[in-house]
């Protein structure tokens, strides 16, 4: 049985991470949250007051405090910068609203993409992000591109924030998601777009379990054929 690589891309709050985690657990695969890596770099920039021209300082800080993932007692994923648990810190609104400019820096993308490729080398991995199928793993055996309406994605993010105890306003989130979509799809380095061979799936009004079933069936078919 071949261990394949699954790339799940899509805009903010399209359900990538939720779906990827479930499928990884079902298949016994490793899940890599690439968004958390860019959020960690953004957290470093904000905490130190760094700007675009300080990219080398961000990279130095990442080298001193490497990003790592650990499992909590309940099975959830924890994100660390060095020995600091930043799992909740990188989900705060200030990080969310600044991650686009940090992730658009070519030097940051190059460093994190190299890290992601090293992790994926052995297969049996699911990665979600914005350029997994186009840049990070262009030869992934299965590529999925999830989309959903801005309204639905704002509702998902609102619910997520409330559950995590993060202050949220629906209309503000809606405007922020629309702005993030524009930034992500118009940046010069690795813009958000579906790979030519990706399966595009609109998750608007679709349950998480239905999305999981759709992708997992595709994955199992490829695994069985290998």
UniProtKB/Swiss-Prot annotation:
Entry annotated with the keyword Nucleus: no
Keywords of this entry: ATP-binding, Cytoplasm, Kinase, Nucleotide-binding, Transferase
A GO MF term: CMP kinase activity
Disulfide cross-links: none
A cellular-component GO term for this protein: cytosol
E.C. no: 2.7.4.25
Subcellular location: Cytoplasm
GO biological process terms held by the UniProt record: nucleobase-containing small molecule interconversion; pyrimidine nucleotide metabolic process
Xref: InterPro entries: Cytidylate_kin (IPR003136), Cytidylate_kinase_dom (IPR011994), P-loop_NTPase (IPR027417)
Chief place of localization: cytoplasm
Enzyme category, top tier: transferase
Substrates-to-products reaction catalysed: CMP + ATP = CDP + ADP; dCMP + ATP = dCDP + ADP
Transferase recorded as keyword: yes
Highest taxon above the source species: Bacteria
Residues annotated as binding ATP: 10-18
Family: Belongs to the cytidylate kinase family. Type 1 subfamily.
HAMAP family recorded: Cytidyl_kinase_type1 (MF_00238)
Name of the protein this chain belongs to: Cytidylate kinase
Organism: Streptococcus equi subsp. equi (strain 4047)
Taxon lineage: Bacteria, Bacillati, Bacillota, Bacilli, Lactobacillales
Gene coding for it: cmk
């Amino acid at each position: 049985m071949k261990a394949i690589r699954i790339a799940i891309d899509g805009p903010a709050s399209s359900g990538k991470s939720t779906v990827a985690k479930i499928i990884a657990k079902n298949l016994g695969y490793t899940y890599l949250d690439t968004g958390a890596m860019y959020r960690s770099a953004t957290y470093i920039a904000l905490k130190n007051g760094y700007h675009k021209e300080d990219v080398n300082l961000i990279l130095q800080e990442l080298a001193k405090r490497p990003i790592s993932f650990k499992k909590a007692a309940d099975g959830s994923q924890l994100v660390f910068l060095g020995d600091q648990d930043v799992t909740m810190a990188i989900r705060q609104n200030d990080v969310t609203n600044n991650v686009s400019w940090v992730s658009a820096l070519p030097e940051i993308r190059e460093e994190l993409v190299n890290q992601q490729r090293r992790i994926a080398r052995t297969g049996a991995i699911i990665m979600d992000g914005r350029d997994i199928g186009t840049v990070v793993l262009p030869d992934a055996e299965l590529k999925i591109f999830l989309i959903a309406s801005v309204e639905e994605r704002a509702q998902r993010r609102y619910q997520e924030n409330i559950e995590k105890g993060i202050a949220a306003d629906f209309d503000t989130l809606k405007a922020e998601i629309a702005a993030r979509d524009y930034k992500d799809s118009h940046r010069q380095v690795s813009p958000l777009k579906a790979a030519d061979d990706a399966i595009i799936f609109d998750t608007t009004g679709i349950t998480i379990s239905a999305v999981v079933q759709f992708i997992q069936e595709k994955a199992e078919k490829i695994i069985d054929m290998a």
